[in-house]
Amino acid sequence: MANTTGEPEEVSGALSLPSASAYVKLVLLGLIMCVSLAGNAILSLLVLKERALHKAPYYFLLDLCLADGIRSAICFPFVLASVRHGSSWTFSALSCKIVAFMAVLFCFHAAFMLFCISVTRYMAIAHHRFYAKRMTLWTCAAVICMAWTLSVAMAFPPVFDVGTYKFIREEDQCIFEHRYFKANDTLGFMLMLAVLMAATHAVYGKLLLFEYRHRKMKPVQMVPAISQNWTFHGPGATGQAAANWIAGFGRGPMPPTLLGIRQNGHAASRRLLGMDEVKGEKQLGRMFYAITLLFLLLWSPYIVACYWRVFVKACAVPHRYLATAVWMSFAQAAVNPIVCFLLNKDLKKCLRTHAPCWGTGGAPAPREPYCVM
Protein backbone atom coordinates (compact mmCIF):
# COMPACT_ATOMS: atom_id res chain seq x y z
CA MET A 1 0.00 0.00 0.00
CA ALA A 2 1.08 3.57 -0.53
CA ASN A 3 2.88 5.23 2.37
CA THR A 4 1.72 8.83 2.60
CA THR A 5 3.53 9.93 5.74
CA GLY A 6 6.80 10.75 4.01
CA GLU A 7 8.73 8.79 6.73
CA PRO A 8 11.17 6.11 5.55
CA GLU A 9 9.98 2.65 6.43
CA GLU A 10 13.42 1.32 7.33
CA VAL A 11 16.82 2.85 7.98
CA SER A 12 19.90 1.24 6.49
CA GLY A 13 23.53 2.25 6.53
CA ALA A 14 23.92 1.98 2.80
CA LEU A 15 22.87 5.43 1.60
CA SER A 16 24.65 5.21 -1.74
CA LEU A 17 21.86 3.27 -3.47
CA PRO A 18 19.08 5.79 -2.70
CA SER A 19 21.31 8.71 -3.71
CA ALA A 20 22.27 6.99 -6.97
CA SER A 21 18.63 6.14 -7.65
CA ALA A 22 17.58 9.72 -6.98
CA TYR A 23 20.33 11.00 -9.29
CA VAL A 24 19.14 8.72 -12.11
CA LYS A 25 15.55 9.84 -11.56
CA LEU A 26 16.52 13.51 -11.69
CA VAL A 27 18.55 13.09 -14.89
CA LEU A 28 15.85 11.07 -16.67
CA LEU A 29 13.01 13.36 -15.66
CA GLY A 30 15.04 16.44 -16.60
CA LEU A 31 15.70 14.93 -20.03
CA ILE A 32 12.01 14.07 -20.43
CA MET A 33 11.05 17.64 -19.52
CA CYS A 34 13.48 19.19 -22.02
CA VAL A 35 12.42 16.90 -24.88
CA SER A 36 8.73 17.36 -24.09
CA LEU A 37 8.84 21.15 -23.83
CA ALA A 38 11.03 21.62 -26.92
CA GLY A 39 9.29 19.03 -29.10
CA ASN A 40 5.74 20.02 -28.25
CA ALA A 41 6.57 23.73 -28.64
CA ILE A 42 8.10 23.19 -32.10
CA LEU A 43 5.21 21.00 -33.23
CA SER A 44 2.61 23.47 -31.94
CA LEU A 45 4.29 26.40 -33.69
CA LEU A 46 4.42 24.48 -36.97
CA VAL A 47 0.71 23.64 -36.82
CA LEU A 48 -0.20 27.23 -35.96
CA LYS A 49 2.04 28.82 -38.60
CA GLU A 50 1.58 26.55 -41.62
CA ARG A 51 -1.72 27.03 -43.43
CA ALA A 52 -1.33 23.60 -45.05
CA LEU A 53 -1.64 22.06 -41.57
CA HIS A 54 -4.86 23.87 -40.68
CA LYS A 55 -6.90 20.67 -40.82
CA ALA A 56 -8.91 18.66 -38.33
CA PRO A 57 -6.24 16.01 -37.52
CA TYR A 58 -3.61 18.65 -36.84
CA TYR A 59 -5.98 20.62 -34.61
CA PHE A 60 -6.36 17.50 -32.48
CA LEU A 61 -2.59 16.99 -32.55
CA LEU A 62 -2.11 20.61 -31.45
CA ASP A 63 -4.39 20.01 -28.47
CA LEU A 64 -2.42 16.90 -27.47
CA CYS A 65 0.88 18.78 -27.76
CA LEU A 66 -0.31 21.70 -25.67
CA ALA A 67 -1.63 19.35 -22.97
CA ASP A 68 1.66 17.41 -22.83
CA GLY A 69 3.66 20.63 -22.71
CA ILE A 70 1.57 22.05 -19.86
CA ARG A 71 1.85 18.76 -17.99
CA SER A 72 5.65 18.86 -18.31
CA ALA A 73 5.83 22.50 -17.23
CA ILE A 74 3.47 22.25 -14.23
CA CYS A 75 3.56 18.70 -12.82
CA PHE A 76 7.13 17.52 -13.43
CA PRO A 77 8.93 20.31 -11.48
CA PHE A 78 7.10 19.23 -8.32
CA VAL A 79 8.27 15.65 -8.91
CA LEU A 80 11.84 16.91 -9.29
CA ALA A 81 11.52 18.82 -6.02
CA SER A 82 10.16 15.79 -4.17
CA VAL A 83 12.98 13.56 -5.45
CA ARG A 84 15.55 16.19 -4.51
CA HIS A 85 14.19 16.40 -0.95
CA GLY A 86 14.36 12.65 -0.37
CA SER A 87 10.93 11.59 -1.67
CA SER A 88 9.01 14.00 0.53
CA TRP A 89 6.44 16.72 -0.17
CA THR A 90 7.60 20.12 1.04
CA PHE A 91 4.59 22.12 -0.14
CA SER A 92 1.07 22.57 1.22
CA ALA A 93 -1.69 19.97 1.12
CA LEU A 94 -3.75 22.17 -1.19
CA SER A 95 -0.92 22.37 -3.71
CA CYS A 96 -0.66 18.57 -3.59
CA LYS A 97 -4.33 18.26 -4.51
CA ILE A 98 -3.94 20.78 -7.34
CA VAL A 99 -0.92 19.00 -8.82
CA ALA A 100 -2.63 15.61 -8.51
CA PHE A 101 -5.75 17.02 -10.16
CA MET A 102 -3.66 18.35 -13.07
CA ALA A 103 -1.82 15.03 -13.50
CA VAL A 104 -5.04 12.99 -13.59
CA LEU A 105 -6.71 15.60 -15.81
CA PHE A 106 -4.00 15.38 -18.48
CA CYS A 107 -3.98 11.58 -18.35
CA PHE A 108 -7.73 11.29 -18.95
CA HIS A 109 -7.64 14.11 -21.50
CA ALA A 110 -5.10 12.20 -23.58
CA ALA A 111 -7.23 9.05 -23.34
CA PHE A 112 -10.45 10.83 -24.37
CA MET A 113 -8.73 12.71 -27.20
CA LEU A 114 -7.12 9.57 -28.59
CA PHE A 115 -10.52 7.88 -28.60
CA CYS A 116 -12.10 10.82 -30.45
CA ILE A 117 -9.21 10.86 -32.92
CA SER A 118 -9.68 7.15 -33.62
CA VAL A 119 -13.35 7.77 -34.44
CA THR A 120 -12.47 10.64 -36.80
CA ARG A 121 -9.81 8.49 -38.49
CA TYR A 122 -12.42 5.83 -39.15
CA MET A 123 -14.85 8.43 -40.50
CA ALA A 124 -12.15 9.91 -42.75
CA ILE A 125 -11.60 6.55 -44.47
CA ALA A 126 -14.99 4.84 -44.31
CA HIS A 127 -17.25 7.90 -44.72
CA HIS A 128 -15.04 10.48 -46.34
CA ARG A 129 -17.80 12.63 -47.86
CA PHE A 130 -19.53 13.04 -44.52
CA TYR A 131 -16.17 13.67 -42.82
CA ALA A 132 -15.08 16.30 -45.36
CA LYS A 133 -18.42 18.10 -45.06
CA ARG A 134 -18.94 18.01 -41.31
CA MET A 135 -15.43 18.11 -39.83
CA THR A 136 -15.03 21.89 -39.74
CA LEU A 137 -13.08 24.11 -37.36
CA TRP A 138 -16.10 24.48 -35.08
CA THR A 139 -16.64 20.72 -35.02
CA CYS A 140 -13.02 20.22 -33.98
CA ALA A 141 -13.44 22.84 -31.26
CA ALA A 142 -16.57 21.06 -30.00
CA VAL A 143 -14.76 17.70 -29.88
CA ILE A 144 -11.82 19.21 -28.00
CA CYS A 145 -14.13 20.95 -25.51
CA MET A 146 -16.02 17.70 -24.97
CA ALA A 147 -12.76 15.85 -24.23
CA TRP A 148 -11.69 18.50 -21.71
CA THR A 149 -15.13 18.50 -20.06
CA LEU A 150 -15.14 14.73 -19.63
CA SER A 151 -11.57 14.85 -18.30
CA VAL A 152 -12.53 17.45 -15.70
CA ALA A 153 -15.52 15.31 -14.72
CA MET A 154 -13.21 12.34 -14.13
CA ALA A 155 -10.45 14.25 -12.31
CA PHE A 156 -12.54 16.58 -10.14
CA PRO A 157 -14.39 14.20 -7.72
CA PRO A 158 -11.20 13.15 -5.84
CA VAL A 159 -10.74 16.80 -4.83
CA PHE A 160 -13.69 16.15 -2.48
CA ASP A 161 -11.99 12.98 -1.16
CA VAL A 162 -13.82 10.58 -3.47
CA GLY A 163 -10.74 8.50 -4.22
CA THR A 164 -8.31 10.68 -2.32
CA TYR A 165 -5.44 12.67 -3.83
CA LYS A 166 -2.32 12.30 -1.67
CA PHE A 167 1.44 12.34 -1.95
CA ILE A 168 2.67 8.82 -2.67
CA ARG A 169 6.24 8.47 -1.42
CA GLU A 170 7.06 5.45 -3.59
CA GLU A 171 6.04 7.40 -6.72
CA ASP A 172 7.49 10.80 -5.72
CA GLN A 173 4.29 12.50 -6.83
CA CYS A 174 0.81 13.55 -5.75
CA ILE A 175 -1.71 11.22 -7.37
CA PHE A 176 -4.52 8.80 -6.56
CA GLU A 177 -4.04 6.85 -3.36
CA HIS A 178 -4.81 3.35 -4.61
CA ARG A 179 -5.78 0.99 -1.81
CA TYR A 180 -7.76 -2.21 -1.52
CA PHE A 181 -11.01 -1.83 -3.47
CA LYS A 182 -13.20 -2.36 -0.39
CA ALA A 183 -11.57 0.65 1.31
CA ASN A 184 -11.32 3.12 -1.58
CA ASP A 185 -13.17 4.40 -4.63
CA THR A 186 -10.40 4.50 -7.25
CA LEU A 187 -11.44 1.28 -9.00
CA GLY A 188 -14.05 3.09 -11.08
CA PHE A 189 -11.50 5.59 -12.37
CA MET A 190 -9.08 2.83 -13.38
CA LEU A 191 -11.85 0.87 -15.09
CA MET A 192 -12.84 3.97 -17.06
CA LEU A 193 -9.28 4.45 -18.28
CA ALA A 194 -9.02 0.79 -19.28
CA VAL A 195 -12.35 0.93 -21.14
CA LEU A 196 -11.24 4.03 -23.03
CA MET A 197 -8.00 2.42 -24.16
CA ALA A 198 -9.77 -0.78 -25.17
CA ALA A 199 -12.43 1.14 -27.12
CA THR A 200 -9.77 3.17 -28.94
CA HIS A 201 -7.98 0.05 -30.13
CA ALA A 202 -11.32 -1.52 -31.09
CA VAL A 203 -12.04 1.43 -33.41
CA TYR A 204 -8.60 1.09 -35.00
CA GLY A 205 -9.25 -2.63 -35.41
CA LYS A 206 -12.50 -1.86 -37.20
CA LEU A 207 -10.64 0.61 -39.44
CA LEU A 208 -8.06 -2.06 -40.26
CA LEU A 209 -10.82 -4.51 -41.21
CA PHE A 210 -12.45 -1.87 -43.41
CA GLU A 211 -9.19 -1.23 -45.25
CA TYR A 212 -8.62 -4.97 -45.64
CA ARG A 213 -12.06 -5.51 -47.16
CA HIS A 214 -11.61 -2.56 -49.54
CA ARG A 215 -7.99 -3.27 -50.46
CA LYS A 216 -8.91 -4.07 -54.10
CA MET A 217 -10.49 -1.51 -56.42
CA LYS A 218 -13.63 -2.50 -58.29
CA PRO A 219 -13.19 -2.68 -62.07
CA VAL A 220 -14.74 0.11 -64.10
CA GLN A 221 -17.96 -1.03 -65.76
CA MET A 222 -18.51 0.73 -69.06
CA VAL A 223 -22.15 1.63 -69.73
CA PRO A 224 -22.99 1.58 -73.45
CA ALA A 225 -24.51 4.66 -75.03
CA ILE A 226 -28.09 4.54 -76.36
CA SER A 227 -29.02 5.53 -79.93
CA GLN A 228 -32.02 5.16 -82.24
CA ASN A 229 -30.97 7.66 -84.91
CA TRP A 230 -27.18 7.90 -84.48
CA THR A 231 -27.49 10.61 -81.81
CA PHE A 232 -25.77 8.69 -79.03
CA HIS A 233 -26.89 9.72 -75.57
CA GLY A 234 -27.10 8.21 -72.12
CA PRO A 235 -24.57 7.46 -69.36
CA GLY A 236 -22.02 5.96 -71.76
CA ALA A 237 -22.07 8.77 -74.30
CA THR A 238 -18.86 10.75 -74.85
CA GLY A 239 -20.39 13.79 -76.53
CA GLN A 240 -18.83 13.14 -79.92
CA ALA A 241 -22.21 12.94 -81.69
CA ALA A 242 -23.22 16.35 -80.33
CA ALA A 243 -19.84 17.80 -81.29
CA ASN A 244 -20.20 16.47 -84.85
CA TRP A 245 -23.70 17.94 -85.13
CA ILE A 246 -22.55 21.37 -83.92
CA ALA A 247 -19.60 21.32 -86.35
CA GLY A 248 -21.98 20.73 -89.25
CA PHE A 249 -21.16 17.10 -89.90
CA GLY A 250 -24.28 15.68 -88.32
CA ARG A 251 -27.58 14.83 -89.95
CA GLY A 252 -31.03 14.52 -88.51
CA PRO A 253 -32.35 16.05 -85.30
CA MET A 254 -30.14 17.62 -82.67
CA PRO A 255 -28.90 15.08 -80.09
CA PRO A 256 -30.66 15.20 -76.71
CA THR A 257 -29.01 16.53 -73.57
CA LEU A 258 -26.03 14.39 -72.63
CA LEU A 259 -26.17 13.14 -69.07
CA GLY A 260 -22.40 12.85 -68.89
CA ILE A 261 -21.92 16.59 -69.42
CA ARG A 262 -24.69 18.28 -67.48
CA GLN A 263 -25.06 17.29 -63.86
CA ASN A 264 -27.29 18.57 -61.15
CA GLY A 265 -25.89 20.38 -58.14
CA HIS A 266 -26.09 17.38 -55.80
CA ALA A 267 -24.16 15.11 -58.14
CA ALA A 268 -21.58 17.79 -58.85
CA SER A 269 -20.92 18.31 -55.15
CA ARG A 270 -20.18 14.62 -54.67
CA ARG A 271 -16.60 13.72 -55.39
CA LEU A 272 -14.54 10.60 -55.15
CA LEU A 273 -11.59 10.25 -52.79
CA GLY A 274 -8.38 10.58 -54.79
CA MET A 275 -5.42 8.27 -54.32
CA ASP A 276 -3.27 11.05 -52.84
CA GLU A 277 -5.98 11.82 -50.30
CA VAL A 278 -6.30 8.13 -49.44
CA LYS A 279 -2.55 7.89 -48.84
CA GLY A 280 -2.62 11.05 -46.74
CA GLU A 281 -5.48 9.82 -44.56
CA LYS A 282 -3.81 6.43 -44.10
CA GLN A 283 -0.54 8.14 -43.17
CA LEU A 284 -2.34 10.19 -40.52
CA GLY A 285 -4.06 7.04 -39.29
CA ARG A 286 -0.72 5.25 -38.88
CA MET A 287 0.75 8.22 -37.04
CA PHE A 288 -2.14 8.53 -34.60
CA TYR A 289 -2.23 4.78 -34.02
CA ALA A 290 1.49 4.85 -33.21
CA ILE A 291 0.77 7.61 -30.67
CA THR A 292 -2.09 5.54 -29.22
CA LEU A 293 0.02 2.39 -29.05
CA LEU A 294 2.86 4.21 -27.28
CA PHE A 295 0.34 5.67 -24.83
CA LEU A 296 -0.83 2.13 -24.05
CA LEU A 297 2.70 0.71 -23.74
CA LEU A 298 4.01 3.52 -21.54
CA TRP A 299 0.99 3.65 -19.23
CA SER A 300 0.29 -0.10 -19.00
CA PRO A 301 2.95 -0.91 -16.34
CA TYR A 302 1.59 1.84 -14.07
CA ILE A 303 -2.01 0.74 -14.65
CA VAL A 304 -1.01 -2.83 -13.76
CA ALA A 305 0.58 -1.52 -10.55
CA CYS A 306 -2.63 0.37 -9.72
CA TYR A 307 -4.77 -2.73 -10.23
CA TRP A 308 -2.26 -4.68 -8.16
CA ARG A 309 -2.81 -2.27 -5.26
CA VAL A 310 -6.58 -2.38 -5.69
CA PHE A 311 -7.06 -6.16 -5.87
CA VAL A 312 -4.04 -7.66 -4.06
CA LYS A 313 -4.08 -6.84 -0.37
CA ALA A 314 -1.36 -9.13 0.95
CA CYS A 315 1.58 -8.22 -1.31
CA ALA A 316 2.93 -4.74 -2.07
CA VAL A 317 4.18 -3.62 -5.48
CA PRO A 318 7.98 -3.98 -5.87
CA HIS A 319 9.67 -0.60 -5.53
CA ARG A 320 11.83 -0.87 -8.65
CA TYR A 321 8.90 -1.93 -10.80
CA LEU A 322 6.76 0.93 -9.49
CA ALA A 323 9.51 3.52 -10.03
CA THR A 324 10.09 2.28 -13.59
CA ALA A 325 6.35 2.33 -14.32
CA VAL A 326 5.96 5.89 -13.01
CA TRP A 327 8.86 7.21 -15.08
CA MET A 328 7.53 5.43 -18.16
CA SER A 329 4.24 7.28 -17.70
CA PHE A 330 6.24 10.52 -17.49
CA ALA A 331 8.02 9.67 -20.75
CA GLN A 332 4.68 9.58 -22.58
CA ALA A 333 4.63 13.39 -22.51
CA ALA A 334 7.76 13.50 -24.70
CA VAL A 335 7.17 10.82 -27.34
CA ASN A 336 4.41 12.43 -29.42
CA PRO A 337 6.61 14.98 -31.25
CA ILE A 338 9.20 12.30 -32.02
CA VAL A 339 6.57 9.98 -33.49
CA CYS A 340 5.00 12.78 -35.53
CA PHE A 341 8.26 13.94 -37.09
CA LEU A 342 9.25 10.35 -37.89
CA LEU A 343 5.98 9.21 -39.47
CA ASN A 344 4.48 12.36 -41.00
CA LYS A 345 6.00 13.65 -44.24
CA ASP A 346 4.07 16.92 -44.16
CA LEU A 347 5.45 17.81 -40.74
CA LYS A 348 8.99 16.94 -41.81
CA LYS A 349 8.58 19.08 -44.92
CA CYS A 350 7.35 22.05 -42.89
CA LEU A 351 10.18 21.59 -40.40
CA ARG A 352 12.77 21.61 -43.19
CA THR A 353 11.16 24.71 -44.65
CA HIS A 354 11.60 26.64 -41.40
CA ALA A 355 14.97 25.05 -40.57
CA PRO A 356 16.85 24.66 -43.89
CA CYS A 357 20.03 23.54 -42.16
CA TRP A 358 18.24 20.31 -41.16
CA GLY A 359 17.35 19.51 -44.75
CA THR A 360 19.46 17.65 -47.24
CA GLY A 361 20.60 20.59 -49.29
CA GLY A 362 18.98 23.67 -47.84
CA ALA A 363 16.57 25.87 -49.74
CA PRO A 364 16.54 25.32 -53.53
CA ALA A 365 18.35 27.96 -55.58
CA PRO A 366 16.14 30.17 -57.77
CA ARG A 367 16.06 29.29 -61.44
CA GLU A 368 17.34 31.71 -64.05
CA PRO A 369 14.69 33.22 -66.33
CA TYR A 370 14.59 31.91 -69.84
CA CYS A 371 12.41 32.19 -72.90
CA VAL A 372 11.42 29.65 -75.52
CA MET A 373 12.48 30.66 -79.02
Swiss-Prot record:
Q: At which residues is glycosylation annotated?
A: N3, N184
Where located?
Cell membrane
* GO cellular component, as recorded: plasma membrane
Signal sequence interval, chain numbering: none
Q: Which Pfam families match?
A: 7tm_1
Residues exposed to the Cytoplasmic side: 48-59, 119-139, 210-287, 344-373
The residues exposed to the Extracellular compartment are: 1-26, 81-97, 161-188, 309-322
Q: Where are the transmembrane segments?
A: 27-47, 60-80, 98-118, 140-160, 189-209, 288-308, 323-343
Q: Which UniProt keywords apply?
A: Cell membrane, Disulfide bond, G-protein coupled receptor, Glycoprotein, Membrane, Receptor, Transducer, Transmembrane, Transmembrane helix
Q: What is the disulfide pattern of this chain?
A: C96-C174
Provide the topology term for how it sits in the membrane. Multi-pass membrane protein
Give the main localization category.
membrane
Cite the PROSITE patterns for this sequence: G_PROTEIN_RECEP_F1_2 (PS50262)
What is this protein for, i.e. what is its function? Is a receptor for the SMIM20 derived peptides Phoenixin-14 and Phoenixin-20. It mediates the Phoenixin-14 and Phoenixin-20 augmentation of gonadotropin-releasing hormone (GNRH) signaling in the hypothalamus and pituitary gland. In the ovary, it mediates the effects of Phoenixin-14 and Phoenixin-20 induced granulosa cell proliferation during follicular growth.
Q: Which family does it belong to?
A: Belongs to the G-protein coupled receptor 1 family.
What's the name of the protein?
Answer: Probable G-protein coupled receptor 173
Q: Which organism is it from?
A: Mus musculus (Mouse)
Which lineage is the organism of this entry classified under, starting from the top rank?
Eukaryota, Metazoa, Chordata, Craniata, Vertebrata
